[in-house]
Amino acid sequence: MEPEPEPAAVEVPAGRVLSARELFAARSRSQKLPQRSHGPKDFLPDGSAAQAERLRRCREELWQLLAEQRVERLGSLVAAEWRPEEGFVELKSPAGKFWQTMGFSEQGRQRLHPEEALYLLECGSIHLFHQDLPLSIQEAYQLLLTDHTVTFLQYQVFSHLKRLGYVVRRFQPSSVLSPYERQLNLDASVQHLEDGDGKRKRSSSSPRSINKKAKALDNSLQPKSLAASSPPPCSQPSQCPEEKPQESSPMKGPGGPFQLLGSLGPSPGPAREGVGCSWESGRAENGVTGAGKRRWNFEQISFPNMASDSRHTLLRAPAPELLPANVAGRETDAESWCQKLNQRKEKLSRREREHHAEAAQFQEDVNADPEVQRCSSWREYKELLQRRQVQRSQRRAPHLWGQPVTPLLSPGQASSPAVVLQHISVLQTTHLPDGGARLLEKSGGLEIIFDVYQADAVATFRKNNPGKPYARMCISGFDEPVPDLCSLKRLSYQSGDVPLIFALVDHGDISFYSFRDFTLPQDVGH
């Protein structure tokens, strides 16, 4: 069976409108790609006619494919102009669907990066001009791909990812958080004050309104504090507040030492006097006794007990001085709530009980220490720890710790084999981003080129707020040197918590590599 005759080749100059005959010939030509492989590759030329014929046929198919010209509908093309002095492509007509994930606006004009324009030109979406002359794909490759714009390797990776459906944007160094922002755990994507509609978010309460509320609260409390400073005489002690609300500390009363301000209710009579705290005697100078340190006695301060075995379930109303002006306190009986508490003991297996029993042997209750109980503040507790540390250092044997060469560990530090290995290990665990902040000033070598977003995010992708990338891409050629450790640390620090991927291009074949952290296992049982 004879093969069908192929239509005559029609050479059409770029940008010219086709006639009916030329359009029919261009549309009726074969749309199949040439065969990529013609059998196994020969190791050496043998000079045979069959081998020469296979080579000739492969070359003809390749040149025929390269010489084939694209025919597109003129009305569906977006006119664009290449501006080499500015390094971008400016659109002359409204953009199409590609504008959702590609391009940027500047000075009220729609513009494309060179790699985006070249990709759209290959896809048949734009009509590119330069100096009012249409450009072919070959001419666009020569003009748009330079060392000052985008290299050929970078465009190969860009077009490869775009054909796979990913959203590819240029990497913005300004999106890298500073060391101070990373220390505060600030995320760049959270710093934007725009919501889904592009409008600025309104906070629930502005600082001005907060200041007004605080000022109104101070004004409402000020008359009460003045009135409480000079209480009127009364016959019933239960109706007279025994505390002064303008001070947070307990104040001295006429009949006894002090009473806790934060008690749940006013206690009538002197039966509650002297309950709460005691004062140490201060120094007396010129007949005036100085204020001593307060010592709270928490055994005598009644806190609400909500346990089911509690016999006192009636909670008194709080003092009116502790409540806002428009809030009234009342007594509450918590008996019904105490009966609803779940008092079932946790059921543990035998292995869990043994594990808890073994762990309890090495646990010490800090609150059971008498010296700790005598501490009334964090400052005294820290001073106690410091004194104990000095005492332990003085007990060390001088023939071991008084020499230039000392032991690696003290007996108190050897709590487990894992702790001993951690202290005596020479190689410490490290990560690639560690120490990368001081390497940011060093330039040269590999750089992050593209931010890659997943293909399923195209429908919801927004260029003004793209969010966190799926990966960041570094591009290198097969004949280029392998990146050193400084470059890897610098790039990993720039990438942050976004995975860093290296694209290696070998004559059109693209491979992707990445570095992952791993932890070596430690045998702490021997």
UniProtKB/Swiss-Prot annotation:
Listed Pfam families: tRNA_int_end_N2
Outcome when changing A307S? In PCH2A and PCH4
Does the record's keyword annotation contain Heme? no
Chain coiled-coil ranges: none
Region feature Disordered, mapped onto this chain:
27-47, 192-290
Record-stated family: Belongs to the SEN54 family.
Protein name (record): tRNA-splicing endonuclease subunit Sen54
| Annotated source species | Homo sapiens (Human)
Q: Which gene encodes it?
A: TSEN54
